[in-house]
Amino acid sequence: MADSGLDKKSTKCPDCSSASQKDVLCVCSSKTRVPPVLVVEMSQTSSIGSAESLISLERKKEKNINRDITSRKDLPSRTSNVERKASQQQWGRGNFTEGKVPHIRIENGAAIEEIYTFGRILGKGSFGIVIEATDKETETKWAIKKVNKEKAGSSAVKLLEREVNILKSVKHEHIIHLEQVFETPKKMYLVMELCEDGELKEILDRKGHFSENETRWIIQSLASAIAYLHNNDIVHRDLKLENIMVKSSLIDDNNEINLNIKVTDFGLAVKKQSRSEAMLQATCGTPIYMAPEVISAHDYSQQCDIWSIGVVMYMLLRGEPPFLASSEEKLFELIRKGELHFENAVWNSISDCAKSVLKQLMKVDPAHRITAKELLDNQWLTGNKLSSVRPTNVLEMMKEWKNNPESVEENTTEEKNKPSTEEKLKSYQPWGNVPDANYTSDEEEEKQSTAYEKQFPATSKDNFDMCSSSFTSSKLLPAEIKGEMEKTPVTPSQGTATKYPAKSGALSRTKKKL
């Protein structure tokens, strides 16, 4: 094309009669094997929406100058790499830290064949196909998902666009990486990292089931990915074994397999527009993985993903789903009940801690399920019993009590067995016989305490007892007991009780009855 055409709104090529628009790079299809490139869009990971940018006019002029001084025989080889230079040199994998994913619009799919060599088919869908492809220049292998937009229809195309936007916005070691996107009027090509070991479900089918250690590694990676998504207000909504790909695997010294997994298929994923938009309504997902609140058509939150993690974990350990039925209606009934069973012999080798995690993941009430962040901190994953963060508010304490009543009972038993300060005081005998000049009998003290309570009622008997015991002198106490009393924090109830000054000298000697 003539250089003067760059300064006009549009012009026609004398060889192919194709029109080019201002600020849009076009390559003559009659002179090269590459269809015209229309628009290059750039997307930032800091935003779900994609920011579009056109190739600058200065760069086009520079390319035209280079093209003019180049011989005719060299023209095809240079122009055939226009997309490659734009995507790989400026926005390639090496520059991924800048958070840019190129979205290149082209006339047809021939341009992609100039960049990639297509290989085996990795998977098929109702209106799409996934093919292994090798970059001709770098020899890097990728998985290209090709979707026929015409067959998919408008609703499916919207889901595809949402999936693309979400993949452009995320970056996590256990979430599939989107390298770039090519789009024609009829098709869309997603170039993603290749997971050569295939789906996690295929590996499970071959093994039968995983050991507890093997499952722990997988769940830790999965929980990390889901915690990242939830922290960014993204709900996957279709977690299942088929949507967990295996990038690579490693056999350790114990002959156990360690899998590097990637969460994929964000077709049903949704990003909440704000923190206040906590609940979702649409019923979606795969039945055996669906949470009770989803199948009941109730409002639900990101906790539906937690239930799905529980189903995945159960299947990894057992080799089959936690709920099986002859019909979908009966299946949903079992899911609503949420009763887990561990009668099979395979569970004999599984620790109680792992079973406890399953129960916490698959609580019927989503409010009582642990979160992805709490799962990451669970001692079953960390191996550290002290790693779990203690609850900081009443709701969290109530949830912990519901999830781990045994541990709460153990803590309560320990506290009961631990001698209290009052018991130490009772057993303590001071050196020698030190007479108390103001000594009064127990009956007299009881009468005085009752009279005081009537005159100055406290909020509870416990508060009154705390108030009374707080007046006990520590002058004659041994250092151990004295230090313990000084370290004891003053609770709000104690503060309330001490508002009322003692009007009787005998009150200062009142003891808490044991």
Swiss-Prot record:
Enzyme class, UniProt record, top EC level: transferase
Cellular component, GO annotation: manchette; nucleus; perinuclear region of cytoplasm
Active-site residues (renumbered): D238 (proton acceptor)
Annotated control of activity: Specifically inhibited by CDD-2807 ((3-([1,1'-Biphenyl]-2-ylethynyl)-1H-indazol-5-yl)(2,6-diazaspiro[3.5]nonan-2-yl)methanone).
Domain Protein kinase positions: 116-381
Domain of life assignment: Eukaryota
Annotated stretches, region: Disordered: 65-91, 402-468, 485-514
InterPro entries: Kinase-like_dom_sf, Prot_kinase_dom, Protein_kinase_ATP_BS, Ser/Thr_kinase_AS
The protein's role, per its UniProt record: Serine/threonine protein kinase required for spermatid differentiation and male fertility. Promotes sperm flagella assembly during spermatogenesis by mediating phosphorylation of fibrous sheath proteins AKAP3 and AKAP4. Also phosphorylates vimentin/VIM, thereby regulating the dynamic behavior of the intermediate filament cytoskeleton.
Subunit structure: Homodimer.
Family (UniProt): Belongs to the protein kinase superfamily. CAMK Ser/Thr protein kinase family. CaMK subfamily.
Protein name: Serine/threonine-protein kinase 33
Organism: Homo sapiens
Gene name of the encoded protein: STK33
